[in-house]
Curated annotation (Swiss-Prot):
Keywords: Acetylation, Disulfide bond, Glycoprotein, Phosphoprotein, Secreted, Signal. It comes from Coturnix coturnix. This is Ovalbumin. Major protein of egg white. The record marks 353-354 as: Reactive bond homolog.
Length: 383
């Protein structure tokens, strides 16, 4: 499964570079892993250059066994699709330690005949699978149905993923992908230690935020050459943790963003660099929800055929003109004090000399510990 982690990390930073162009000073939140798994679902039925483009952009071409035929991909257990399924099953199963809801599905115009093997395969591997709806004569009802499904899958959190007029009678296919995350820390922050303090959005501007605080032993690294610090906070599940990448300076985010990459993050978070130390941690409460048009994002990254008349999705349906004109990704994350073990009050461990104070813009990610797959990646400019 490790190679999937590498692919998702590489893809994560490719997406980040592209989103940054259009969201220069905004909060950002997306799930590289969820987008990757959705593209894997499409990849199963893509042919020719449509397939080659997905292969390249999502780095599947570097993974063993990914290019096999649909029969081979569904029939074997030791391949990438089943590894993706195993991670998805692990992170989305009912758990007291966190709630991680994923809604990912393809919707096709009901008059198109879908290849039975494809239907069977995506159902088996990707739960959401493919659903037929009537865009042709009831586009708005179809939109309502899709929105209701995403809302129910994310426990009411992500609503109206498809905006009015995003589908019409000409729509052949829509791809929706949404993720909602609420985590429980391994070590809780005590609510009474949370205080309202200024968060410095820029050198000139600040805003009051609810700043959580605790003192504890955490993996941390100070990178003098990169002018930043990294902190790892484990979630109670034991399967995930959150990395916070904090520039030393209020205006240091730009430098961090221009240097960060799959290779760099792997190096920075290696056991030779990060070590467990006693730290005073200050982290703002966060509630973030972002929505992105995947069509324009993926086209800019090199997946162009899928969204145009050049698309070859003959592994999904024999209809010659089938393409995906509309693809949307939504992500939600809530970070607060809640945790499994309540440690003593922050004042009890005043012997910690090191401080990690996230009171200015930073990057963060939620990762799957076993595989290093990046489940969520975010930029917090203004909590």
């Amino acid at each position: 499964m490790g190679s999937i982690g590498a692919a998702s990390m590489e893809f994560c930073f490719d997406v980040f570079k592209e989103l940054k162009v259009h969201h220069a000073n905004d909060n950002m939140l997306y799930s590289p892993f969820a987008i990757l798994s959705t593209l894997a679902m499409v990849f199963l039925g893509a042919k020719d250059s449509t397939r080659t483009q997905i292969n390249k952009v999502v780095h599947f071409d570097k993974l063993p066994g990914f290019g096999d035929s649909i029969e081979a991909q569904c029939g074997t257990s030791a391949n990438v699709h089943s590894s993706l399924r195993d991670i998805l099953n692990q992170i989305t199963k009912q758990n007291d330690a966190y709630s991680f809801s994923l809604a990912s599905r393809l919707y096709a115009q009901e008059t198109y005949t879908v290849v039975p093997e494809y239907l069977q395969c995506v159902k088996e591997l990707y739960r959401g699978g493919l659903e037929s709806v009537n865009f042709q004569t009831a586009a708005d009802q179809a939109r309502g149905l899709i929105n209701a499904w995403v809302e129910s899958q994310t426990n009411g959190i992500i609503r109206n993923i498809l905006q009015p007029s995003s589908v019409d009678s000409q729509t052949a296919m829509v791809l929706v992908n949404a993720i909602a995350f609420k985590g429980l820390w391994e070590k809780a922050f005590k609510a009474e230690d949370t205080q309202t303090i200024p968060f410095r959005v820029t050198e000139q501007e600040s805003k009051p935020v609810q700043m959580m605080h605790q003192i504890g032993s955490f993996k941390v690294a100070s990178m003098a050459s990169e002018k930043m610090k990294i902190l790892e906070l484990p979630f109670a599940s034991g399967t995930m943790s959150m990395l916070v990448l904090l520039p030393d300076d209020v205006s240091g985010l730009e430098q961090l963003e221009s240097t960060i990459s799959f290779e760099k993050l792997t190096e920075w978070t290696s056991s030779s660099i990060m070590e467990e130390r006693k730290v005073k941690v200050y982290l703002p409460r966060m509630k973030m929800e972002e929505k992105y048009n995947l069509t324009s994002l993926l086209m800019a990254m090199g997946i162009t055929d899928l969204f145009s008349s050049s698309a070859n999705l003959s592994g999904i349906s024999s209809v010659g003109s089938l393409k995906i004109p509309q693809a949307v990704h939504a992500a939600y994350a809530e970070i607060n004090e809640a945790g499994r073990d309540v440690v003593g009050s922050a004042e009890a461990g005043v012997d910690a000399t090191e401080e990690f104070r996230a009171d200015h813009p930073f990057l963060f990610c939620v990762k799957h510990i076993e595989t290093n797959a990046i489940l969520l990646f975010g930029r917090c400019v203004s909590p």
